[in-house]
């Protein structure tokens, strides 16, 4: 069983990388070359493949047509309602911001990937426009970014603040690049005025915090590639203004959508309203821990039956 969480072969090392200006460098090129060599060997040896979205493993089908007969399942990173119930029964302290101070705390929780900087820049440019056009709303806004480096060790590098400084909005931004533990992340999400969800320039991208964000019962501002599975999920589970969704595409990039992001951001800061009636709770059941575990178990059963049949 291969859990193909992130594509091994993509834009990294080809058009983007760890070099100056986000361009490919020697390390990213070598990483891509190694992935191109190892990937076919690994997927050929796998009896089944799981991924967070069907678009992720469909890339493998495009590269290796013979893989189409291999059992595959899309198993997104879901959320468990019981975790939120337990958290609300036993509140944890919030040492990062005061949810009752009258400010609008818009919180992002999760790693900021290299291909996500274009989206980040568009969001911060929208915040800069808010400062120019609606200084009253800008003064109320607080943008918090948690776990952006995905590192748990002290001294994790800043990823958001340098961009915020360059765009002149650092006075509204705080960043805690170190990764939060699970319950702290849920605490931030449940106590935020609203939750910010940002995607990547890659079509397949899906957010690991999407379902916890929906279960947090807070308004959402989501900025994603139009082909991301996140867009379909949000539009099928939560209506505006509870979930405000701005999309971009391959031609109409995130930078071209700053005005649309500004409109939604301004409306959100002016009235960060959450309406539980706007959420299709029944549709969220299929992304609970129990439902996703059942989906994985069904795939394992399928592999087991095929293996036994092959041994007979």
Q: What feature does the model see in each segment?
A:
Residues 47, 187-204:
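Acidic donor-binding loop of glycosyltransferase active sites
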Residues 85-105, 133-136, 269-272, 302:
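Nucleotide-sugar donor-binding and catalytic loop/hinge architecture
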Residues 9, 29-100:
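Donor nucleotide-sugar binding/catalytic pocket of nucleotide-sugar-dependent glycosyltransferases
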Residues 1-36:
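Acceptor-binding helix/loop patch of EC 2.4 sugar-transfer enzymes
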Residues 140, 144-149, 154-179:
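Nucleotide-activated donor-binding/catalytic signature segment of Leloir-type glycosyltransferases, i.e.
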Residues 248-259, 269-301:
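A charged, aromatic-enriched C-terminal amphipathic alpha-helix characteristic of glycosyltransferases
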Residues 95-117, 124, 292:
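Conserved donor-binding/catalytic core segment of Leloir-type glycosyltransferases
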């Amino acid at each position: 069983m291969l859990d193909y969480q992130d594509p091994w072969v993509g834009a990294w090392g080809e058009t983007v990388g760890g070099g100056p200006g986000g361009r490919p460098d020697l390390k990213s090129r070598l990483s891509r070359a190694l992935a191109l060599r190892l990937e076919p060997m690994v997927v050929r040896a796998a009896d089944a493949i799981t991924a967070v979205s069907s678009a992720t493993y469909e890339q493998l089908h495009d590269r290796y047509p013979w893989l189409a007969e291999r059992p595959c399942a899309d198993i997104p990173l879901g959320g468990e309602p019981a975790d939120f119930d337990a958290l609300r029964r036993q509140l944890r302290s919030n040492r990062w911001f005061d949810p009752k101070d009258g400010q609008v705390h818009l919180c992002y929780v999760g790693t900021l990937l290299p291909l996500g900087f274009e989206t980040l820049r568009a969001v911060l440019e929208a915040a800069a426009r808010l400062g120019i056009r609606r200084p009253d709303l800008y003064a109320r806004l607080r943008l918090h970014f948690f776990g952006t480096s995905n590192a748990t060790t002290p001294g994790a590098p800043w990823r958001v603040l340098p961009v915020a400084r360059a765009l002149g909005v650092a006075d509204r931004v705080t960043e805690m690049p170190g990764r939060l533990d699970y319950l702290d992340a849920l605490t931030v999400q449940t106590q935020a005025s609203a939750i910010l969800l940002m995607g990547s320039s890659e079509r397949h991208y899906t957010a690991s915090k999407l379902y916890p964000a929906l279960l947090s019962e807070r308004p959402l501002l989501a900025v994603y590639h139009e082909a991301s599975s996140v867009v379909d999920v949000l539009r099928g589970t939560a209506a505006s203004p509870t979930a405000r969704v701005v999309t971009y595409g391959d031609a109409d990039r995130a930078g071209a959508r700053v005005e649309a992001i500004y409109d939604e951001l301004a409306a959100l800061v002016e009235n960060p309203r959450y309406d539980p009636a706007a959420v299709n709770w029944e549709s969220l059941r299929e992304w609970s821990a129990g439902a996703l575990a059942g989906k994985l178990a069904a795939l394992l059963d399928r592999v087991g039956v095929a293996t036994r049949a092959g041994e007979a």
